[in-house]
Amino acid sequence: MKKKQASPRVIIIVGANCGIGYYMVKYLLEHGDYISVLDIELDNLKKLKENYPDRLITIIADAAKDEDIKNGVSETIKQFGKIDIAVHNACLCTFESESDSNYELYNKVMNINFFGALRLSKAILPKMRKQGFGRIIFTSSGVGVTGFGNISPYASSKGAIESLAKCLEIENQKYGISFHLFHPPLTNTASASKLPVPKEFMASPQKVGEGLARHIDSKKFVICHSFSQAMQMKLCYRHPLYMGKMMWKMTTRAKNHGGQ
């Protein structure tokens, strides 16, 4: 029997048409929450919308556009009356080295991954401060902590949101608002498909999405879907460069042996 929330929450998620975000939405709806999804594509959510017409809002929105996010937040509050939790899950991942990446690419990735998180925060913080509570979660990545080869635009953007979340947590704790980071493992999603890593070493997006949704109320600053992932992240935070170099060597070895 599924455990229902004592008081249904209103949760807005930017980037949830597929992968980890989709399974977060599905799990949260099944457990009684009200969900608003902002994404540039919404096709995969049609069935969920049919099953939960009164508890799921889907809004076409681009994480890189201020007005889209502002309008999505306003529409969510208009229909559901409040927002308890906001999640920035949209991301753009590229697999180029620094020498193959121009400023335009860095700006494009930062605009979605970092400034997208900031956009959501700026759109929703005035509302949360007024209501006196709320939590905002950014989906981060281990490479934002450790570094990694041929992925510096993406890794840099994730490193930036690590610092942003810490700063905004300090600034907003007096309002009853907390900031957190989701830290999923390497997951079998479209964005990770180009990595030369055997699929059997990647986590299931359903397992990760459901696990993160289950812990969405965690008081921990870093939220993981499982105990083993939490232990791995402890190592990454304690020995960042060592872990980054080790993972890069392992990935390079897998690529040289034809692991896809």
Predicted regions and their residues:
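Active-site helix of classical SDR
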Residues: 121, 157
